[in-house]
């Protein structure tokens, strides 16, 4: 039998019997000539940043899941159920996001451009409006953000092409394309998120003591340092509130120089406070006030507070607004500061539009509008200075708030307006006859734009979400060191959520590694199994009826020779 098989094989090779040769040699040829899939194309690993997940006042916000293991699709696909929906920021809309959630998508991955500063302004404004709505809608769908690279962009385009072809083809074409197309399985490396216990929110304070008796009035200058956006690891908070912290540090530098000399040492205590947890209902400020007003007998906040100035989002725009919960009465120091702000803006910077915005505190809201409301609740005169007219402006809580959104000249100008107005109040310069158009900070005492820029660069070089800044972070130690250069008694204050009834709860798994594996669909395995079964069936029939096959081949060979 083996000799006969060898003879048949030899005759097939000599006579080039195409049908049988095709059947016998095709599988081996395909295995030999098929190029192996490059490792880079077979799998791609990239970093993803999860959407916010936190509880505030017992109310859950953001996404509640972190685990992802499902096949990729784009919005062009008709069926999104249990699929990882890829979206590019430039094509993103809230309607598409809601559609993916309604269809029970397995996950959503939003691809961000590499250079956020180059994103068109209309796209930036639209996404800033969408972010609060995304967070307000609690969802069980994992939502991730990824920064675009060439491999990820290629994955998106291939997935988009496959999704689009399925929606516009016939059933047979869809089946064929589904069987032959390449898909991508998206898998995260982390585990399910869980609550972080005993998380501390840290704040930093420092002071400049006034010259004179013990019962000197105190001016408090406050700015919260933490940033907020739809994804904590992408929250740089340049304007909100890196600009406020930059101004606070520059004011500390300027007044520390004035308080160094007896001739310019004013009869006011200056208390500087860089608060944490500002984006979470000002938790750092709340605990700081409780510690100073309820749990101690010696505090500058208990004695004689002239007013509290909160700085929030002052790095761009051509206007400044002083937000108050109660309009200041004439004859008070806070009213004098309001008038000095108006005077400096009108005479030294006429291009700046200044106004006072009055808004009552709404205790029915889960989150206070502005930081000064924390002080107003404790009956301390306070206001917030910002270039934003409304606390609902999306610029206060967006991952789009990057370094390029802060204009250096505008930040320097606003710092000068604040410093000039404070100085005129503290030293009573208007009553002493100083012309309103005469600047105080000139020559060696002028505002340093380079200093403001370097601080802004440092602040926006790292995410400052409250979930990422612990008490031992390099950011806090650097901030504390910076304040120690100019102020006395610099120290940290910590707030930890109550275990029984926590006001805030943070969750982990905010940054993960995601793998995109190139895979064939399940129907491809089915068709492949059918093809293999058919081939094996043909081979089985050929072996079982080898004598018939042998005679047929001989007859064909004889006919070929006679011709």
From Swiss-Prot:
- Is this entry keyworded Transmembrane? yes
Segments on the Lumenal face = 43-522
Does the keyword field hold 4Fe-4S? no
State its location(s).
Endoplasmic reticulum membrane
Q: In which tissues is it expressed?
A: Highly expressed in pancreas and skeletal muscle and, at lower levels, in heart.
CDD domains in the record, alphabetically?
A: M28_nicalin_like (cd03882)
Molecular function in Gene Ontology = ribosome binding
Q: List, in alphabetical order, the GO biological process terms annotated in this UniProt record.
A: determination of left/right asymmetry in lateral mesoderm; multi-pass transmembrane protein insertion into ER membrane; negative regulation of nodal signaling pathway; protein stabilization; regulation of protein complex stability; regulation of protein-containing complex assembly; regulation of signal transduction
Q: Mind listing the UniProt keywords for this protein, alphabetically?
A: Endoplasmic reticulum, Glycoprotein, Membrane, Signal, Transmembrane, Transmembrane helix
* Pfam family of the protein (one): Peptidase_M28
Question: Signal sequence: where?
Answer: 1-42
Q: Please give the positions of the paired cysteines in each disulfide bond.
A: none
Topology term for the membrane: Single-pass membrane protein
User: So which residues have sugars stuck on them?
Assistant: 241, 428
Q: Which InterPro entries match?
A: Nicalin, Peptidase_M28
Q: List the ranges whose topology is Cytoplasmic.
A: 544-563
Superkingdom of origin organism: Eukaryota
Q: Which residues cross the membrane?
A: 523-543
Q: Name one GO cellular component term.
A: membrane
How this chain assembles, per its entry, is:
Component of the back of Sec61 (BOS) complex, composed of NCLN/Nicalin, NOMO (NOMO1, NOMO2 or NOMO3) and TMEM147. The BOS complex is part of the multi-pass translocon (MPT) complex, composed of three subcomplexes, the GEL complex (composed of RAB5IF/OPTI and TMCO1), the BOS complex (composed of NCLN/Nicalin, NOMO and TMEM147) and the PAT complex (composed of WDR83OS/Asterix and CCDC47). The MPT complex associates with the SEC61 complex.
Role played: Component of the multi-pass translocon (MPT) complex that mediates insertion of multi-pass membrane proteins into the lipid bilayer of membranes. The MPT complex takes over after the SEC61 complex: following membrane insertion of the first few transmembrane segments of proteins by the SEC61 complex, the MPT complex occludes the lateral gate of the SEC61 complex to promote insertion of subsequent transmembrane regions. May antagonize Nodal signaling and subsequent organization of axial structures during mesodermal patterning, via its interaction with NOMO.
Q: Which family does it belong to?
A: Belongs to the nicastrin family.
Protein name according to UniProt:
BOS complex subunit NCLN
- The source organism is Homo sapiens (Human)
């Amino acid at each position: 039998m083996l000799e006969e098989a060898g003879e048949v094989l030899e005759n097939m090779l000599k006579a080039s019997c195409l049908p049988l040769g095709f059947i016998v040699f095709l599988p081996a040829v395909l295995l030999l000539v098929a190029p192996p899939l490059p490792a880079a194309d077979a799998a791609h690993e990239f970093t993803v940043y999860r959407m916010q997940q936190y509880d505030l006042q017992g109310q859950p916000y953001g996404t509640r899941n972190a685990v992802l293991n499902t096949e990729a699709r784009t919005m062009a696909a008709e069926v999104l159920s249990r699929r990882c929906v890829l979206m590019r920021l430039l094509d993103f809309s809230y309607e598409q996001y809601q559609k993916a959630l309604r269809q029970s998508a397995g996950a959503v991955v939003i691809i961000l451009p590499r250079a956020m500063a180059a994103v068109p302004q209309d796209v930036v404004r639209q996404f800033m409006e969408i972010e609060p709505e995304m967070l307000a809608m609690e969802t069980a769908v994992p939502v991730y953000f990824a920064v675009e690279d060439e491999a990820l962009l290629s994955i998106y385009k291939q997935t988009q092409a496959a999704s689009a072809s399925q929606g516009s083809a016939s059933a047979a074409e869809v089946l064929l394309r589904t069987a032959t197309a390449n898909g991508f399985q998206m898998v995260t490396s982390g585990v399910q998120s869980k609550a972080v216990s005993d998380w501390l929110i840290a704040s930093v304070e420092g002071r400049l003591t006034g010259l004179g008796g013990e019962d000197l009035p105190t001016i408090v200058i406050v700015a919260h340092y933490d940033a907020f956006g739809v994804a904590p690891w992408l929250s740089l908070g340049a304007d909100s509130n890196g600009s406020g912290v930059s101004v606070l540090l520059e004011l500390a530098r300027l007044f520390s120089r004035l308080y160094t000399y007896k001739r310019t040492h004013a009869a006011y205590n200056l208390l500087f406070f860089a608060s944490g947890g500002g984006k979470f209902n000002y938790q750092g400020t709340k605990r700081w006030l409780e510690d100073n007003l309820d749990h101690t007998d010696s505090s500058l906040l208990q004695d004689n507070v002239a007013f509290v100035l909160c700085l929030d989002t002052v790095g761009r725009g051509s206007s400044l607004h002083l937000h108050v919960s109660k309009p200041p009465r004439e004859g008070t120091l806070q009213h004098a500061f309001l008038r000095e702000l108006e005077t400096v803006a009108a005479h030294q910077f006429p291009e700046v539009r200044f106004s006072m915005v009055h808004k009552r505190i709404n205790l029915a809201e889960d989150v206070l509008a502005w930081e000064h409301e924390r002080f107003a609740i404790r009956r301390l005169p306070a206001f917030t200075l910002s270039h934003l007219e409304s606390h609902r402006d999306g610029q206060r809580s967006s991952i789009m708030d990057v370094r390029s959104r802060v204009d250096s000249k505008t930040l320097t100008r606003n710092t000068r307006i604040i410093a000039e107005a404070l100085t005129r109040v503290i030293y009573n310069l208007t009553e002493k006859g100083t012309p309103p158009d005469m600047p105080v900070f000139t020559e060696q005492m002028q505002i340093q734009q380079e200093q403001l820029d370097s601080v802004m660069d440092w602040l926006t070089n790292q995410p400052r979400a409250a979930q990422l800044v612990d008490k031992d972070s390099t950011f806090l130690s650097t901030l504390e060191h910076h304040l120690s250069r100019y102020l006395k008694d610099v120290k940290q204050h910590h707030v930890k959520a109550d275990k029984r009834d926590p006001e805030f709860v943070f969750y982990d798994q905010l940054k993960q590694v995601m793998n995109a594996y190139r895979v064939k669909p399940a129907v491809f395995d089915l068709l492949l199994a059918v093809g293999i079964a058919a081939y094996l069936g043909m081979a089985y029939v050929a072996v079982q009826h080898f004598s018939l096959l042998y005679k047929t081949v001989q007859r064909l060979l004889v006919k070929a020779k006679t011709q």
